[in-house]
């Protein structure tokens, strides 16, 4: 599985990657990169003993399906995948690569479907978005068969603390300074 790190930053540019590599953090989520650049991103991270979770739906120039997942895992050697697509989660698991199922909670129906998908797919983790739904997912946090993550709309360390104290295992943030400022 992934290294222990409560707050995982999302890295979207080479400049942000360079800043990330100056921190002691061991893992990040890569998104918004073009497929041609993603291999370099992963190589740079691995050279510095960092792990990369690839958000497959937000990689430019790649189909975000099971074949795209297979390419990222087998040829680019991503350490984990994050996706809202069941076929991608299944492909990651088939390749013994950690899989994070991203769920967007828009209403009670999407919450119910997300819980059902989590039970069926058995991902290594499930990430709920936006993070503000954490009071609604409290029952699932206790009974989830995997780690429960939250992401989206996280503005400060106080919000991270609220989430982790409610049972959320990990939090994803788009602001690297939040990841480096968090002290458990």
Task: Label the model's feature ranges.
Residues 30, 130-136, 152-184:
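Glycine-rich phosphate-binding active-site loops on the catalytic face of alpha/beta enzymes
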Residues 20, 85, 126, 163:
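Conserved, mostly hydrophobic/aromatic
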Residues 39-58, 74-76, 86, 90-102, ...:
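Alpha-helix-loop-beta-strand connector modules within alpha/beta enzyme cores
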Residues 10-14, 58-63, 82-85, 104-107, ...:
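Glycine-rich beta-to-alpha transition loops that act as phosphate-gripper elements at the mouths
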Residues 9-21, 64-71, 108-119, 156-160:
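Short, acidic/polar
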Residues 64-88:
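Ordered, amphipathic secondary-structure segments that act as subunit-interaction surfaces
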Residues 29, 53, 82, 100-101, ...:
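Conserved beta-strand positions in the central sheet of alpha/beta enzyme cores
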Residues 1-56, 60-63, 77-79:
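Conserved N-terminal beta1-alpha1 strand-loop-helix module at the mouth
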């Amino acid at each position: 599985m992934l290294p222990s790190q409560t707050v995982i930053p999302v890295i979207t540019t080479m400049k942000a990657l360079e800043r990330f590599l100056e921190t002691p953090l061991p893992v990040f989520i890569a998104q918004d990169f073009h497929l041609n650049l993603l291999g370099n991103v992963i190589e740079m991270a691995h050279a510095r003993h960092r792990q990369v979770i690839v958000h497959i739906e937000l990689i430019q120039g790649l189909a975000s399906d099971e074949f795209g997942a297979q390419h990222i895992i087998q040829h680019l050697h991503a350490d984990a995948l994050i996706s809202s697509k069941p076929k991608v989660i299944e492909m990651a698991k088939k390749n013994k690569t950690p899989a994070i199922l991203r769920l967007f909670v828009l209403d009670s129906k999407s919450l119910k479907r997300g819980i059902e998908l989590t039970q069926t797919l058995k991902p290594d983790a499930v990430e709920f978005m936006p993070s503000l739904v954490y009071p609604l997912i409290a029952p699932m946090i206790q009974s989830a068969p995997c780690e429960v993550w939250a992401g989206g709309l996280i503005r400060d360390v106080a919000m991270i603390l609220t989430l982790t104290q409610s049972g959320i295992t990990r939090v994803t943030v788009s602001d690297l300074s939040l990841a480096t400022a968090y002290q458990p």
